[in-house]
């Protein structure tokens, strides 16, 4: 593998044995691609905004004399960029402008004569835009739209598993689900009649819908039944014989062949042998006794040829009398329905008999009554209702997916078709459900991923937009019919409010529009790749059963079987597997390598769950020889959802990677294959809660996916194009682009601005730091700056800690964690949290609130940190209770006399009395002010601080743009100087030229002169561009802010809080091994090894065996080896000053070559001495290793690593007790584990209360930290005190410490006076009980004597 300059800084040793055929696809593509399809103009009009417009327009007036047509749309430019939207608290969106055409037709002239056409561009609201990282900024906060897994439209056949009827009989049903429109269900009842339901309403006999579709009884019978033909003879009947139909029947008569030989005697059962004999003798007719026909059903109406009277009606039971009537009328032939109990049931025949209707009109009326009970049906209304249910494109749409699923399920060859149902579709569904009831077909599995599809952002936004358009459509149609259209323009017809309201509602408050989880890069990526079965049109937690939540065989490579929440949402919220993607229909696909004749090719194909069932697929870890041929005879594979063994020649596909089945979060867990799935689930979930530490540290033991994740998440800055680093400071990186990557006529400079100390959604700190230096070459995709939780472009969620598995004085009982004081001293787990506190000044009825430093009844010291405008200065250290923004509110005064009121109205004098309503630091918070923002309403005078901030921003913008201009100008000038050099100017001449004269020189060569003129033009453009950009920036900064009604001013103060690690904080490894810190131990008391190095953390060994997460032990061993190798390299670097680099080079080469069949090849010999030295220096802290899931380091390789590091291969060391110096009685497992600090900090949870707020009804203290509440003393605690006999304690708990109002106020006074006595009274809850009993009509009074 070829490494770029920056990749050579630190190479992760990879233990992977399988070749990487396919890189992990871009992780956010599910979000970005979906939204791109929504906003991009689609000429076919099948998706996105275009489809929504085309489905609603043209809108015709009721009279048909005018219509509004859609022409095209365009999205404008957003007013503010993403960062500005976040600061100002507005939505990042672009205006949607639609070109509409209004056509007026001439009433008098022939139909279709156009009288007038008006075209106009109409504003139709703002559409929120997606940022480059797949999020939306809605009202200043970043949100993610989670994709939804819902049941695909189409037709599904199912049964009730025998749960409906007491007999346990299985009742089959069919359901046609459209993308939008009414659901149509068919179902059997226990008596085997077929019923239909529309939209889950009352059921009707299924033949009603057939009658409504204009089928007669005769046609219905012909559709669903075969016939049996009889010829009527004098005393007998002759039946046309189909031998197969006799199978399994008991003969009620002798069955003879054509010669009269008896084949089956009466009373015997007809077997397959008898049928073969009948077929052999070519018997086509069979004489049967007259009684044989009794109980059969006529296949058609039989009419007396003379009188026209119906002798036997279709579907009626035939008796001997009917037969006699037919004989008398001279009818010689008779057809009956072929019915048998086994596989040709009489279902439709039975249904027809309970069907109350006889013709189409009656059927339509019956359907109308069921859909609109209580309304009088008319013929037209009934017709229109039925037509609109399933056959109108406006009301019903199966969608492309639905039609494809429908046709495939019913074996209709074409995948395309109409979006509405046809007569044939409904008949085909009925035939299929009867087919299933007869035992010829299987029901569907609704949890199969072929029957569930993904609805992503774009599709949901399109649906929501269509909802808004439909609301507008009604209004437009009315306006087209009412007004004088000659005067009106399209703009006057359209009101954009309903559209923007629908879109806003979706992005702002839909269940699937979620506040982005921004703890760390992994949590961001996982949130964007989340697939939820909940939400509108999906399941609900309560109704979701066990089957829906369970792992299904089709999840393989599509949804992760490990990563899902614990708790009520388990299995309903899933994560996309690493390589999965959605196809054009919205079904999940996963890639496979093609296998031809037992040889694995590198050709990759994506298969959906439905396609996968047809093939035989082997796993990625099968043995292959050097030519890619499978070695073993029998190969473990999957076929039709089952695991089985097959010959190599039968294998058709193979997995692309062992990590294919798991999500990115699960594939970050090293040695995942050695962990129990429950613990792996916790490990995957807890990595998302890791807080970014002050200094990120890459994991020593990783899985090789860390870099991909960090780059794809968008928190690091990656180079867009190759070049050389030209300039680096803390907030900007400038890259001079390579000549071959330049676009014609550009300056060739890329500027990357870094994000500094901003707040994330979870109040953690987002900060980017450059990790490159001037002069370094970069290629596209190289990491230039690290973000939160990344280290040299690798994801780094925690810290590598030296760990020992041993008990230590009970401090690691029940998963507690003992840590060394050194960890806190070195700030290993120190995190920075940024809080945003807002102070809003409103206009009240009594006058305006004012932000000022002049606050009543507040001492000088409390105001010491405020400036003259009453706002805290940046850099101030504040603690709980300090004033951040001084604010006074007018206070309601005593009743004014009419004269005073008049004076107040005339002179507009403010209320004289004000109260302090300043913004203070919350209790238990202390930190440093890092930023202040002031937003002032348009038309309100800005205070001094706001003007200062504005000036600072303008100066900063000028400086930034100026530097950018300078850099770009220098780029143009350097190209011009090179041009002059090539044209014969000497270097001294060029150096002597002033900057402005470089571009105005005259060159003899015409081509070069033209080029120089182009550069001069470019320079002018740059200048103009700079002025324009600065003007826009200045206008944005100085314009007033659009604040909510009644708000005059908002001051936002940002407070940085530094949190060191302390007892009560939650920590975890990556294997689901979580615990709480119990004690921070002095370094000298910690166990230490023979070299005197103490361990950092002591974990309980009992936490491993029962939890079955052995991965952590292997990680500790491999971590020890990696660290040991780092120490050896450090020692060699000390020596290399005398010996040179040869020893280091050999050792590093040895390390990278270690392991059997390892795919990674690092050509250390090709490294220059400088590169090697830089690599070695970066490896001093330990060589990072990658052990991919299901393809990781084996025990033998870990032992080889330990040997290379000069450590015992058992992975255990002798340890000594830090307090006594005595050796522990047996060796202890010591090594390095990657530990995370989770966002469950004791500072956020710890809370205490003495007095505070009380509940209104019960007068008991509230609960929870947010309400400043207390702990509930519940009934179990009462029982405990009763059991102890602690009567007085109990009395005080239930009275003065809870809801005895008088008692507690008295007690407070007593304590203040130093009198420690109490008099308990009546608890309020007793009064509540009395009132509740009185509400039942029983009067209870307390007799106080």
Swiss-Prot record:
Binding partners and assembly: The RNAP catalytic core consists of 2 alpha, 1 beta, 1 beta' and 1 omega subunit. When a sigma factor is associated with the core the holoenzyme is formed, which can initiate transcription.
Enzyme type, top EC level: transferase
Transmembrane segments: none
Catalytic activities: RNA(n) + a ribonucleoside 5'-triphosphate = RNA(n+1) + diphosphate
Alphabetized HAMAP family for the sequence: RNApol_bact_RpoB
EC number(s) stated in the UniProt entry for this protein: 2.7.7.6
Function statement: DNA-dependent RNA polymerase catalyzes the transcription of DNA into RNA using the four ribonucleoside triphosphates as substrates.
A Gene Ontology term for the protein's cellular component: DNA-directed RNA polymerase complex
The keyword Transcription is assigned to this record: yes
Keywords, ordered alphabetically: DNA-directed RNA polymerase, Nucleotidyltransferase, Transcription, Transferase
Family: Belongs to the RNA polymerase beta chain family.
Keyword Transmembrane included in the entry's annotation: no
Protein's UniProt name: DNA-directed RNA polymerase subunit beta
Signal peptide: none
Domain of life: Bacteria
InterPro entries in the cross-refs: DNA-dir_RNA_pol_bsu_ext_1_sf, DNA-dir_RNA_pol_bsu_external_1, DNA-dir_RNA_pol_su2, DNA-dir_RNAP_su2_dom, DNA-dir_RNAP_su2_hyb_sf, RNA_pol_bsu_bac, RNA_pol_bsu_CS, RNA_pol_bsu_protrusion
Gene Ontology molecular functions: DNA binding; DNA-directed RNA polymerase activity; ribonucleoside binding
Encoding gene, per UniProt annotation: rpoB
Gene source species: Shewanella oneidensis (strain ATCC 700550 / JCM 31522 / CIP 106686 / LMG 19005 / NCIMB 14063 / MR-1)
A GO biological-process term: DNA-templated transcription
